[in-house]
Design a protein with these regions (language model features):
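Glycan-recognition and catalytic cores of secretory/periplasmic carbohydrate-active enzymes
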Residues: 1-240
Length: 240
């Protein structure tokens, strides 16, 4: 783990503080993407290493990187938008992963920004929940508007179940907060109904909230991560 952390610090950060998405075996940069998921996972790794090793300098590094992530997201023009100005939208995935990132870092270091981020994400998630479809959507307008296009109708059951997992974990942290628990269980139930393959079992990758054919080539496949997310989320649901 330490050798991997050392490699990340030595080779995986660009001069602007953002991370590369892919580097060569000897650390030369290959690709840099518009997301901050690499940074989020690196922050989690540093927090977990701090916990495992007892070296709290990595807790500080995790927190500083988390603050950088928030700055990257908040700074206009820092991250390349997914769409041109014709479409104004926001995505579910970054809102969701920041809950997990903040909660992992919170286990090794205290800072008000961590709870602040979790509260902000929990509030923002309400924009993606659409009771009329019994679904949590992957993309909505800036104020939660439904975007009735092939991309705006996407349901990613694994992502939604992962969100339920993170929400239930946070609810437990707050002494099983009733409102968060109920919201999470609703998302889990809806997402299970959308994602579960009644014939063969397992969670499939993508659905369309109007029941139309999804665009993604892997829409009817069952990658391994939605299955693991479903296992963890349902264990939390059982505990709740």
């Amino acid at each position: 783990a330490k050798s991997t952390i050392d490699f990340i610090e030595a080779h995986c950060f660009d001069t602007d503080g953002r991370m590369y998405f892919e580097v060569t075996a000897d650390g030369r940069p290959l690709r840099k993407r518009r997301y901050v998921f690499s940074e989020s996972f690196a922050a989690i790794a540093m927090a977990e290493y701090a916990k495992a090793s007892g070296d709290m300098t990595y807790a500080e590094k995790a927190l500083n990187l988390f603050k950088d992530i928030r700055r990257f997201i908040a700074t206009p023009g820092c991250l390349e938008p997914k769409y041109l100005d014709t479409l104004q939208a926001k995505g579910h995935s970054i809102v969701m992963i920041l809950i997990n990132t903040a909660s992992r870092i919170r286990e090794v270091i205290s800072d008000p920004v961590l709870d602040q981020q979790i509260d902000e994400s929990l509030e923002s998630l309400k924009d993606f929940v659409k009771p009329e479809f019994k679904a949590l959507l992957e993309m909505v307008g800036p104020n939660g508007e439904f975007i009735d296009t092939i991309n705006g109708r996407v349901i990613n059951p694994g992502h939604c179940i992962e969100t339920a997992w993170f929400m239930l974990e946070e609810a437990k942290h707050r002494g099983w907060d009733k409102e968060i628990t109920e919201r999470a269980l609703q998302i889990l139930d809806w997402s299970w109904q959308w994602g579960w393959d009644e014939q063969y079992g397992g969670i499939i990758n993508f659905r369309d909230c109007r029941g139309l054919p999804p665009q993604d080539y892997s829409q009817d496949m069952k990658f391994w991560w939605p299955q693991t997310e479903a296992i963890i989320a349902t264990l939390y649901a059982y505990e709740a």
